[in-house]
UniProtKB/Swiss-Prot annotation:
It comes from Acinetobacter baumannii (strain AB0057). GO terms for biological process: pyrroloquinoline quinone biosynthetic process. The keyword Transport applies. This is Coenzyme PQQ synthesis protein B. SUPFAM superfamilies: Metallo-hydrolase/oxidoreductase. It comes from the Bacteria. Pathway: Cofactor biosynthesis; pyrroloquinoline quinone biosynthesis. Signal peptide: none annotated. Belongs to the PqqB family. InterPro entries: Metallo-B-lactamas, PQQ_synth_PqqB, RibonucZ/Hydroxyglut_hydro. Pfam families: Lactamase_B_2. The keyword Transport applies. Keywords: PQQ biosynthesis, Transport.
């Protein structure tokens, strides 16, 4: 399984266009050791030619320009991407579908709850239905594994996780199963497994066992502390109120990752306020000392 990180930042990217927090100001002026990052999305493939997009970022055009393998150039109009899997209906995971409209029809895999949001509050399915066949909806049963034609060796097992629907969704304060999923992706040829959960509000015993059984875990790294948005003065909500588990301290994701012995451990969906973006920070050093990697745009993993 080939895994390519198209984007590794949380909503707004890094630097966020209107933000002057120490990180955004620092990377913009070149005064901190940090990489520019686009909003989170990854692509996976079993042959290096045909790819599945996991979430469609607002930055997808630039991401695909930088990702040369996504353009096999076999004909006048071509792409290596004809399938998109959505983990949720967040704007930073779905607005990229509008940019992909020239490639319609596109197969879009999502749960019924996500489909409801994307035909009402943010009706992207409706908006694109006249674009050469539009978006072709494939329902994900959050309790059943599925496969995608053309990717015979890859199996996808959804996992219902605790997080939050987007603010525009009627499910925001009325959670439903399927608002958010993680994916266990198994390559039956290599017998390797990826656990992908860019939006994760809680780690329980089931998730711990799944992570231990995986060869790579790529999970939510939005915030270093739960009150980070408040402490930096850019917001009033905690990480948990937004559906994101913080990294540090008791109960943080790092305390769980440190219990894992075998998998490659990667944090993705990093908010622009997170000190781990500064590669000279004590927080980045702490992750490195614990064999936890911070995803970056263009990062490649082979399983």
């Amino acid at each position: 399984m080939h895994i390519y990180i198209l984007g590794s930042a949380a909503g707004g990217g890094f630097p966020q266009w209107n933000c002057n927090c120490p990180n955004c100001h620092g990377v913009r002026t070149g005064t901190i050791n940090a990489k520019v990052r686009t909003q989170s999305s990854i692509a996976i493939s079993e042959n290096g030619v045909d790819w599945i997009l996991l979430n469609a970022s607002p930055d997808i055009r630039q991401q695909l320009f930088d990702f040369k393998a996504a353009q096999p150039a076999r004909k006048l109009r071509d792409t290596g991407i004809t399938n998109v899997i959505l983990m949720d209906s967040q704007l930073d995971h779905t607005t990229g579908l509008l940019t992909l409209r020239e490639g319609c029809p596109i197969n879009v895999w999502c749960t019924e709850m996500v489909y409801q949001d994307l035909t009402t509050g943010f009706p992207v399915f409706n908006m694109l239905k006249h674009w050469n066949g539009g978006l072709l909806y494939h329902q994900i049963d959050p309790k059943q594994a599925f496969k995608i034609d053309g990717f015979e060796n890859l199996e996808f097992l959804p996992l219902i996780i605790q997080s939050a629907a987007p603010p525009y969704s009627p499910h925001r304060h009325d959670p439903h199963e399927g608002d958010n999923i993680a994916l266990i992706i198994k390559d039956h040829k290599t017998q390797k497994q990826l656990f992908y959960a860019p939006g994760l509000g809680k780690i329980d015993d089931q998730i711990m066992q799944i992570m231990q059984d995986s060869d790579c875990v790529m999970i939510d790294g939005t915030l270093w502390t739960d009150d980070e948005m408040q402490q930096t003065g850019v917001g009033k909500k905690t990480g948990r109120e937004m559906g994101h588990l913080y990294i540090s301290g008791e109960g943080g994701s790092l305390s769980y990752l440190n219990q894992l012995s075998t998998p490659k451990k990667v944090l993705i969906h990093i908010n622009n306020t997170n000190p781990i973006l500064n590669e000279d920070s004590a927080q980045f050093a702490e992750l490195k000392a614990n064999d936890v990697e911070v995803a970056f745009d263009g990062m490649q993993i082979e399983l």
